[in-house]
């Protein structure tokens, strides 16, 4: 899983770089910058998790769960913010970044789902990693 975390982190970092190029064509450029930064910060988070992986003392099932929580949380974070930028959505969860931008109810629900659903994943994964390191 260490190699997959490295690869996933590098892909997300690359997506963050590409996302930066899309800022000028986003409906909401401020949210576009936020999407760019999500890729640029969440990619290295996955790489750091990969560096910690050999030191984890966790059962296989917990390692697998942690891996998928990290992947889902980081990619949902990037995707949710990026879709909000492209669609002009995200007013409910990021009112300052969204500004006056609003999108269709379906697009707003998609962004809201992604951004709400990543919260448990992004809290659980580092807690499990910490437990695995301290064992």
From Swiss-Prot:
It is a multi-pass membrane protein. It is found in: Cell membrane. The keyword Thylakoid does not apply. Keywords: Cell membrane, Isomerase, Membrane, Transmembrane, Transmembrane helix. Its main location: membrane. It comes from the Bacteria. Disulfide bonds: none annotated. It catalyses: N-phenylhydroxylamine = 2-aminophenol. GO terms for cellular component: plasma membrane. GO terms for molecular function: (hydroxyamino)benzene mutase activity. The chain crosses the membrane at residues 5-25, 33-55, 67-87, 113-133. Catalyzes the rearrangement of hydroxylaminobenzene to 2-aminophenol. Involved in the degradation of nitrobenzene. This is Hydroxylaminobenzene mutase HabA. It comes from Ectopseudomonas oleovorans.
